[in-house]
């Protein structure tokens, strides 16, 4: 019973803070701008990093929701830095896979194939 009361109190407080932030002007526009900037990254990364990207953006979005609801600039800054770090890691992985090949010449055999199967899978000798 005590836990239910605390959860109810927390949710009421979040709703109250969101209402107060609407009148002051909040930073939802900034997060929408970040979301629009992330859309071009979704298309090339759906093969390799799609699930990672969706989880990362979802967790950052939930964090941004609470940061916007509480009006805390420090929390907003932390989630903005987290989003930038995630984007940098995903882009570095994408560029590493694109420009590093086993031959060491900087060119990949097939640029569209970003998801390679594990080494243990031998697809030439598969039996059905």
Curated annotation (Swiss-Prot):
Keyword Transcription regulation included in the entry's annotation: no
Keyword entries, A-Z: Cell membrane, Membrane, Mercuric resistance, Mercury, Metal-binding, Plasmid, Transmembrane, Transmembrane helix, Transport
Presence of the UniProt keyword Transferase in the record: no
UniProt: Hg(2+) binding residues: 47-48, 114-115
Transmembrane residue ranges: 28-48, 71-91
Subcellular compartments: Cell membrane
Major place of residence: membrane
Region (Disordered): 101-128
Membrane topology summary: Multi-pass membrane protein
GO molecular function (one): metal ion binding
Gene Ontology cellular component list: plasma membrane
GO BP annotations, alphabetical order: response to mercury ion
Job of this protein: Involved in mercuric transport. Passes a mercury ion from the MerP protein to the mercuric reductase MerA.
Full protein name: Mercuric transport protein
The organism's taxonomic lineage, starting at the top: Bacteria, Bacillati, Bacillota, Bacilli, Bacillales
